[in-house]
């Protein structure tokens, strides 16, 4: 969806339109819960809620940067396959996306890292990422590697996320887990993202 299409709702009388995904249109603010939702009152009439990956990362990156300072970071998201991919090998602009999504791990780009920097502009130039599309129907996992301004332990990192997850502000946005869960266990989970504490290094 672009600004032009979404603006038709404004012309029809809507006070605000939320694009429930990313947009490349100029003049559309990106608002993500847990990252920059405090700016919603002054945002453009048409706003973007970004992608599922961006929503899962927004609070995580905001907390990492606020608590420890992020110098540089890299994202690898292992993402369930999407409607943009082919179910059998076929020609596409991105040849990898044209390969059978149900039988391949498909490396591709992700706009999530750039979208996170739209919500957390202090991370611009410090955050990049790639995506691996895998043959699962739902749920994705994101692995973030970060160089921080402070030397920290695994316990300190996890405690920052545990503390944040208990704050009223992050309810329904950020969860934590110390259980040995897999993707299927997260189906129906209402958080934007859950930090798997057992995987912190």
Residue ranges and their predicted role:
Residues 1-98, 201:
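N-terminal Rossmann-like NAD(P) cofactor-binding subdomain of oxidoreductases
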Residues 69-72, 77-201:
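C-terminal substrate-binding/catalytic lobe of Rossmann-fold NAD(P)-dependent oxidoreductases
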């Amino acid at each position: 969806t672009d600004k032009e299409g979404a603006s038709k709702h404004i012309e029809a009388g809507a006070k605000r339109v939320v694009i429930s995904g990313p947009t490349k249109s100029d003049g559309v603010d990106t608002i993500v819960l847990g990252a920059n939702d405090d700016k919603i009152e002054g945002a453009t009439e048409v706003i973007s809620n970004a992608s599922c990956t961006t929503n899962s990362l927004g609070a995580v990156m905001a907390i990492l940067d606020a608590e420890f300072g992020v110098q540089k970071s890299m994202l690898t998201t292992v993402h369930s396959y999407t409607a943009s991919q082919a179910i059998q090998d076929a020609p596409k602009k991105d040849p990898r996306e044209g390969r059978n999504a149900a039988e391949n791990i498909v490396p591709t780009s992700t706009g999530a890292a750039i979208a996170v920097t739209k919500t957390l502009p202090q991370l611009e130039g410090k955050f990049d990422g790639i995506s691996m599309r895998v043959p699962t129907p739902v749920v994705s996992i994101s692995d973030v590697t970060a160089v921080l301004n402070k030397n920290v332990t695994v316990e300190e990192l996890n405690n920052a996320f545990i503390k944040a997850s208990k704050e009223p502000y992050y309810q329904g946005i950020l969860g934590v887990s110390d259980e040995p869960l897999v993707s299927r266990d997260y189906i129906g989970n209402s958080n934007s993202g859950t930090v798997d504490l057992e995987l912190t290094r």
